[in-house]
Amino acid sequence: MTILLGVIACGLLSVVYAIWATKSVLAADQGNARMQEIAGFIREGAQAYLTRQYTTIAIVGVVVFIAAWLLLSGAAAIGFLIGAVLSGAAGFIGMHVSVRANVRTAQAASVSLASGLDIAFKSGAITGMLVAGLALLGVSVYYLILTAGLGHEPAAREVIDALVALGFGASLISIFARLGGGIFTKGADVGGDLVGKVEAGIPEDDPRNPATIADNVGDNVGDCAGMAADLFETYAVSVVATMVLASIFFAGAPVLATVMTYPLAICAACIITSIIGTFFVKLGANASIMGALYRGLIVTGALSILGLGAATSLTIGWGSIGTVAGMDITGWNLFLCGIIGLIVTALIVVITEYYTGTNKRPVNSIAQASVTGHGTNVIQGLAVSLESTALPAIVIVGGIIATYQFAGLFGTAIAVTAMLGLAGMIVALDAFGPVTDNAGGIAEMSHLPPEVRKSTDALDAVGNTTKAVTKGYAIGSAGLGALVLFAAYSNDLAYFAANGDKHPYFADVGTISFDLSNPYVVAGLIFGGLIPYLFGGIAMTAVGRAGSAVVEEVRRQFKEKPGIMEGKDRPDYGRAVDMLTKAAIREMIIPSLLPVLAPIVVYFGVLLISGSKASAFAALGASLLGVIVNGLFVAISMTSGGGAWDNAKKSFEDGFVDRNGTRHMKGSEAHKASVTGDTVGDPYKDTAGPAVNPAIKITNIVALLLLAVLA
């Protein structure tokens, strides 16, 4: 009980930090009237979009809430509600701050680069700490209510089902927010670039482009609210899955309650280390923005090792806590698994930066390919996107095997928990991106002096890299988290099958085998494997349609208002924002339901065909593995490849020197080819790739809930 209260106190501390940082950001200077006017357009557009998005999700949520109440229990329905509301709140509040921090960052950048960095990072840290704090509070407070308040045993089905439902609530918000926000932001970006840069020859963030405000709105709803919902879900779902595994592996043991609070204690310790880490993000004498951000991340990671040790010592201790599948599990081994999780995080960050960072081989190779035309740019971009999957996959495989050797599947779960303990700092780095991007746009549209734009460009270039790095982290943690969920599914299934007297549906299941000689297992693997590709294809098509609509709208305005190009007429910014809002909401519904319904279709489809519950459960389990494996590769390929395309385009803004020593500037044929590549890469890295993340996890969560419903 004492540990749990300490966990809740740490969750509250992160919320207090967010409130303090919000007051600090909002107290900063907003700049001149023109800057405030442009920021107002962005703020209104972002709030209008999110309000409409959450209204749509609420309608779906009400249906799911009623279904959970009828099929499971009132506690499960309330758990779903808690997960959904807190996930939405983290993204909404974070975006509420970011659309106010953008103009303040632009103004601060006119004073100094250090001031601009301070405001932008602090606004990102608000979102980060809200994600970590609200997710931890949601799980720990509800767990406390279910056990100490309602008197349920920690491993009781009422508790487990309610916590899994909480994860499902977060998942549902996440997939809608990620996909809807991605369609909006990339529809605006692609459409605006094709007409603005390629046809009209005007630079990015030029106020004459009617899609400019929509593009800046999209940065916030996609990279701030969308990423917040994504990592909130991964955080909550992975902690819940670890607790579910603890309830199965240590059922009946005296240490059960303590082991179930261990992942919560790890996350609580990491919140403290993340808050400390934020104070180390200061521009040094070398004026390296990335260096300042990495200093905060490294301090957080190093302190988290100490925090992990403290959490281990205060909860389970260093000795043996029990035997699982013939393996002696010790506190020391679990501590080592947590460190492996932190090492995996560091390696994924380094690898992703290598594949997406400017002046690195992959990005330079795409820029060089642009010199010979549009086609070679696309070919090289695709090559980099495929190559970028290898090293992260090897790191994840190494992490799985190492942790399994130390403490079995529970060790892998603890590694994922430690990875996600850093979510507060990681989300801060991500939410820093849209703020700096917007600040650059506001500086450009307000005609601030060139030296201000130079500062905002420097911040924005780093923001692009941090966004790519955090996507890599989100995918890696999602892949490992989904593996933990699969372990929870297979162990839950074994528990129900062994206790058929208490759960009549499972009384006649028989032996469930995931053997590859079973044709239903192979069929399940293939069916699961197609979901990320189909989901990604639908998402890319949606961006294409939204982008085409923006192209037509921008062309129409240029044609009907020729004074726009001369600066005599003002574009109708609101038209593009409203059009994209409707398109994104319309396009996100069907693909979002695909991973939700897939597990149900697999189970009942195979049951209908084979007449065997064992075959149906085996096919369902195999489909989950298919989603995890293919989803991991699709997501990494799309996000890293798209990030490389983006920074290859940016290489031409200051002039790219090819292998023959020729300098290619903005507006050159090579630059135009790089814009084409970036147009392909944008929906890759900001829509389809990131949206595969929640799709991987939600299929596993639905499978867990299906077991609970059938039981």
Swiss-Prot record:
Q: One GO CC term of this entry?
A: plasma membrane
Q: Which residues bind Ca(2+)?
A: D646, D678, D682
Q: How does it sit in the membrane?
A: Multi-pass membrane protein
The source's superkingdom equals Bacteria
Query: Which reactions fall under this protein's catalytic activity?
Result: diphosphate + H2O + H(+)(in) = 2 phosphate + 2 H(+)(out)
Q: Where is this site: Determinant of potassium independence?
A: K467
Enzyme Commission number, as recorded: 7.1.3.1
Q: In chain numbering, where does the site feature Important for ion transport fall?
A: R178, D223, D230, D686, K697
Q: Which cofactor does it need?
A: Mg(2+)
Q: Where in the cell is it found?
A: Cell inner membrane
Binding of substrate, residues: K186, K685
Q: Where does Mg(2+) 1 bind?
A: D189, D193
Q: Which UniProt keywords apply?
A: Calcium, Cell inner membrane, Cell membrane, Hydrogen ion transport, Ion transport, Magnesium, Membrane, Metal-binding, Translocase, Transmembrane, Transmembrane helix, Transport
The UniProt transmembrane annotation reads: 1-21, 48-70, 83-103, 126-146, 164-184, 239-259, 261-281, 296-316, 331-351, 382-402, 409-429, 468-488, 520-540, 589-609, 616-636
What residues bind Mg(2+) 2, as annotated?
Answer: N216, D219, D437
Q: Which GO terms describe its molecular function?
A: diphosphate hydrolysis-driven proton transmembrane transporter activity; inorganic diphosphate phosphatase activity; magnesium ion binding
Q: State the family named in the UniProt similarity comment for this chain.
A: Belongs to the H(+)-translocating pyrophosphatase (TC 3.A.10) family. K(+)-insensitive subfamily.
Query: Mind telling me which HAMAP family this protein's record contains?
Result: PPase_energized_pump
Q: How does it assemble?
A: Homodimer.
Its biological function? Answer: Proton pump that utilizes the energy of pyrophosphate hydrolysis as the driving force for proton movement across the membrane. Generates a proton motive force.
- Mind telling me what this protein is named? K(+)-insensitive pyrophosphate-energized proton pump
Gene designation per UniProt: hppA
